């Protein structure tokens, strides 16, 4: 699980765990992009997917530099990560974004832990900070969109209610 990422003793293992997490995220974004209806959200999710692909490209040579073999495929978690999005698609865009938010919560936590380590070489830390900043931006966008969906839902509920009688008028029951 992503909640374990950042706790690895070895830096190469840490970076490989982040690569797996980003590969999982790419798969989840592919599933979300296929299923989401809103064109703006679809485009934004495409940009976020590209960020995760860049994370993999940036982290991979760092693992090699540390003398280890970089992972090249998503972890088994991808089934769970992608599955949240597939199931959410049954109920629409808002739930797809909610599923993606849980995924972004995981990646944010993982990158926060990785950046917080004091044994990470400075050139590796620079990459981790850049990736973490991307993750924060992804989550902020998704949270904003979820808030907008909630506001629209509230507005619709209010507009469908019967208006109150004018002040001073007898109420009819």
Residue ranges and their predicted role:
Residues 2-37, 94-119:
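Alpha-helical bundle segments that constitute or directly flank the non-heme di-iron/ferroxidase center
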Residues 2-4, 10, 24, 47-50, ...:
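Long, non-catalytic architectural segments outside compact domain cores
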Residues 9-18, 37-57, 93-99, 122-134:
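Alpha-helical scaffold segments that form or flank carboxylate-/histidine-based iron centers
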Residues 28, 58, 62, 86, ...:
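Solvent-exposed, charged/polar functional surfaces in cytosolic regulatory/catalytic domains
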Residues 103-173:
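Preference for long, well-ordered alpha-helical segments
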